[in-house]
Amino acid sequence: MSERNDPPREGDEPAGAVAGVADEPGTAAHGGGVAIRDDGGDRPGDGAPQEPSGTNEPPESPGHPDDPDDPDARPDARPDADADPDTEDPRHPQPPTPDDRPHATRAGAPAADASAPAQAGEGAGDPAVPLTEDADPRPGTGKLTGTAEHLIARERQRAESRSRRAAGAALVLVGGVILAVAAFTTPWRVLAAGAPAVAPDPARDFSGAQIARAQAFDAATTLPGYISLGLTVLFAGLLVLTPFAAKVLGVLRGPWWVRVLLGVVVLTAITEVLRWPLGMWFETILRDYGLSTQDWAGWTADRLKNTGVSVLLTAVMLLALVALARRVRRWWIPAAVGAFALTLGVSYVYPVVFEPLFNDFTSMPQGSLRSELLAMAERDGVPVEDVLVADASRRTTALNAYVSGFGATRRIVVYDTLLKAPESEVELVVAHELGHAKHADVLDGTLLGGLLAAFGAIGLFLLVGPLRRRTGIASVADPRAIGVLMGLMTLASLVSDPAQNLITRHVEARADVHALDLTRDPATFVAMQKRLAITNISDLSPDAVEYVLYASHPSSPERIALARSWARLNGVPEP
């Protein structure tokens, strides 16, 4: 449950978790890739800038003669016969096509452009030789006629076309599955048809001073949020449309996998250096409004831990992707399967592997509240062995709760700050989280996220090819390609966020209705929403554009209006 629709703040909830009772500001982020999230929550601002550099240049060979893992570093090595026909192996440039290769001259005469020698096809294993129209075509001569070279080039183009058509068909298929899953699992209507409509009205439930404070906080945080968003788009564009990343990463040496790891570290480090001032700016605002309790040492430690998690997850993805591109002809097939599996795996282990890096968790103390919560879960038919309390007060004054994981790792967590609220309001919050658990919202969201990841892997295959010349890379097998991949992933996240937020707003509304059905106490629900909105300084009247693009939860006035509509529908006194 959330009462905010503000610019993203670092780490509102753990990755893989269904958004909780509040998108509180100022907690540790857990993003991946190169996105800047200096201010978690529901406002613009994913991604980080990285400086532009360079102009378009022809691809440089990424191979290194001292690379012991590079087959071409050894004189007797043969190219990989399984190389993807859709992309040039960085170790074996493709021969020029009939339109761009030097025109053949008389027998034995050198080609007109000695700087672009024709080579045998990728995987052919033949030495590069000048080709002439009457070169010796006999077996064993190591030479091809111009006609033979032309046939090889045409066959390669046909194979590339077939591969791209297959990938395009797969992209359409996966996209259709995504739409079907989203349509089937999203609760587009959370109240029965004919439920009395109630219009949200901030002035009915909040004082003028509270509304003014929320507006002032929104204005203060919007500027860094939009600057962050703009820098994200700018940096991702530099990675995708210029040879900046290829030049920066081209100086790295070592086996290909070492260069990939170092490349992720280098690009992430550039991102962090550039986004650090934005993070400090936002943290200062949180302190000014009393939402942050951290000192600068704690804030720095959280950022460094978040960066480490980001580097780890990004490196795993890109190492797998580059390895597949170097070994498998149609690498996008196992890449899509792997992306789906990785998403499920990370969501499953996140509560027990990554969340403890940012908070300490203890069982809720014995007492009437714990007993009532466990009894409520039993009545709801949701098996819950424990309710955990996170030590969020060392970082924030905001109130929140969330459910994360699925299966054996599923758990319900409340912030220790929430325990200061009346027990009846805490029960409403946990009832909301039980709604997420009962409807398997984390699992549904994870499955949808996995399908989106698979869709993205196929999309990378189709997009990287046209960008090779512009970005100065040879193929996805080139370790320098990770810059393009990180940029594309960042842009894909920005483009898909509005659709994902639309879905989560409906999911959160269904969890609200579940809490009302379970407790049948709309008055306490409204009181709890007011407390959350005032404590967390929620945006009570979010801008329409920001709401559509960035709000992952309904606004507090919308949720209060929903409770009143539920009360009218069920014949309960309207709060």
Model segments located where?
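N-terminal signal-anchor/signal peptide hydrophobic helix marking the start
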Residues: 476-485
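Polar-ligand-bearing catalytic/cofactor-coordination segments
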Residues: 144, 150-171, 180-242, 247-475, ...
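Actinobacteria-biased recognition of intrinsically disordered, low-complexity terminal regions
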Residues: 1-167, 176-179, 572-575
